[in-house]
Every structure is written in C-alpha cells, then in structure tokens.
C-alpha cells in the first residue's frame, strides 16, 4: 500500500486530532495541514483522506475553502479518496456535517470510498448524505465523542482494502 496523504483543516483542533487517530489506525500515512499544504504536495499522493470540520451552518472551514480553491476536479481524477466530516448534529441539525459536501463536489471526479450509514445520528438534513448514506465518515465530537474511536476503527477497516 502506497503512502496515504491525510489532509485536514481545523480551527478548534478537533479535525487534526481525528486526522492523527486515523493515521495511527491506518498506518503508512502522512498528516498534512491544508493551511500549509501546496497543490504539488496534494498531487504527490494517489490515495488521500480529507478531514474537514463544518463551519457554522454548513460552511467549509476557511483553510479548506482556500486550499480547495487551488484544486481542480482533475486533481482528484486519478485518486482514491476517503472523506471525513466533523459536525454538530444538535446545534446544526439542518446542515449537519455539510463541510465535506463542498469537498465531495470536486472529489467525486475521483474514486470516493468509505460511505457510511446515517444510523445512530439524529439530525434533520445534510447535503453530505447521498443515496441514504453519508459521503464519508462523519464525526460529532460535540455530542457523540464517546463513539468516535469505534467509528474511526470501523471506517478504517472498511476503507483499508480500497487503499491497498
């Protein structure tokens, strides 16, 4: 398995902590802060995991917004991509974890893996749901932090084969 690039953007530190947990669980990965990343660095990986918190009511975190603006759909075309979104399903029930939706819109030009069921979450709506599943792993550190490690473990097992 080639090295996986795990790219994250964060304001509170939660997305970085999740990226580190995923790196530890999956092994052979490099964790990269998008605030310091370059397009060339991104394009040096064929396998990436993109970890993005949701800002406010469904917006993409600022560092991700800036970095995503430097990338084209073609930058994703030859990649295998896992998406991980963070959100607060209680406070932002109608836009839960929509930060990853904005990335998914470009990432779907490549091979997106790791869709997960919405079971166990309580929210009204989310653009991050397609075909009844989240477009990636969704973490709620505000309300369900006790489930984070188990969700990461299950998701890593699910996607490992796709990253082989």
From Swiss-Prot:
Transport listed as a keyword: yes
Disulfide bonds listed in the record: none
Keyword Secreted in annotation: no
Gene3D superfamilies noted in UniProt: 3.40.50.360
One MF annotation (Gene Ontology) recorded for this entry: FMN binding
Short name of one Pfam family: Flavodoxin_1
Residues annotated as domain Flavodoxin-like: 4-160
Required co-factors: FMN
Coiled-coil ranges (or none): none
Keywords: Electron transport, Flavoprotein, FMN, Transport
Membership in a protein family: Belongs to the flavodoxin family.
Task of the protein: Low-potential electron donor to a number of redox enzymes.
Full protein name: Flavodoxin
Native source organism of the sequence: Helicobacter pylori (strain ATCC 700392 / 26695) (Campylobacter pylori)
